[in-house]
Amino acid sequence: MKIIIVSGFLGSGKTTFIEKLSKKLDDSVILENDYAKANVDKDLLKNTGKEILSLEEGCICCSKQKDFATTVMSIENTINPEYLIIEPTGLGYLSKIIENISPIEYEKIKILKPIAIVDYYSIDKIMGEYKELFLDQIQNSSY
């Protein structure tokens, strides 16, 4: 199973990107992470025809890190898709997400280079309010 992490700040276009990407990857599952109890992005992705799983009420970079690793292993053991597309909450530190998932990488699970989606029109606002988070996502992505 190849893991694709698509990070980006709130409203950057992660969900739209994942919707288009998942349609190009036949054998893929989407794992949504939302800090809130209601997962809006999960509803937006229903038209992809893909299985969509979610981890809610916390961030996979911190409070949900154990659930995250367990969920990824469970997906590999039960569904075993070719690709697992992960959309972390927009407030997640990509460095911590990578750190949390790296220990479970082995011959059956490969973490591909992370992607960060950036909304050019929001950069000034984000850099003013969330500079550390924004820079973490950019510095830890490959695309």
What would you call each of these model-derived segments?
Residues 2-126:
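Nucleotide-state-sensitive switch-loop elements of NTP-binding domains
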